[in-house]
């Protein structure tokens, strides 16, 4: 989240669960076969084979279907690292593949971004979250911090941003958040 976008690709055959369909993409399939299959075989030593997903090596081990469904109609999502010295939210393309150390929040509006970037949310996270690692870094926990955070009344994540777009509080938060995002992106 704190670095510029990586110049890399992820081969994702989620929409091609059948081996016959996936192997039609010859070069990407060969790459996955050479690298992922061997990696999973090494992981499977001492584990149940279904855990390593050996029989479907071309598929993501955890494809996160709920996240994909929640973000499918969005151009971008709000992302936050699980552990970091500073609490930092950033917009990322919804087509990104999110690792286990990065939380994706299925919202694309500046109001939610602003509320999450606020000092109030940061204080809440410090009180609700825990610490991890040698540097005693804060750990963002979606269940303990995001799900329990008392969003401002009428600006909660279960309400569509368009439904509170006329609210002066939402407009002020969104304007400040948009400026914050612009400054961060241009830094």
State the predicted function of each range.
Residues 1-187:
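S-adenosyl-L-methionine
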């Amino acid at each position: 989240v704190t670095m510029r976008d990586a110049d890399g690709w992820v081969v994702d055959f989620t929409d091609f669960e059948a081996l016959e369909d996936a192997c039609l993409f010859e070069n990407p399939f060969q790459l996955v076969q050479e690298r992922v299959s061997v990696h999973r075989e090494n992981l499977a030593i001492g584990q149940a084979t279904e855990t390593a997903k050996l029989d479907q090596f071309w598929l993501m081990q955890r494809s996160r279907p709920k996240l994909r469904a929640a973000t499918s109609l969005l151009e971008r999502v709000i992302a936050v690292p699980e552990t970091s010295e500073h609490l930092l939210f950033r917009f990322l393309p919804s087509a990104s593949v999110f690792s286990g150390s990065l939380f994706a929040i299925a919202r694309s509006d500046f109001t939610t971004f602003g509320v999450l970037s606020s000092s109030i949310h940061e204080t809440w996270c410090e009180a609700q979250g825990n610490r991890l690692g040698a540097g005693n870094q804060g750990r963002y926990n979606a269940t303990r911090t995001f799900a329990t955070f008392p969003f401002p009344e009428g600006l909660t994540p279960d309400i569509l941003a368009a439904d509170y777009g006329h609210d002066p509080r939402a407009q002020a938060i969104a304007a400040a958040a948009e400026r914050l995002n612009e400054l961060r992106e241009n830094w």
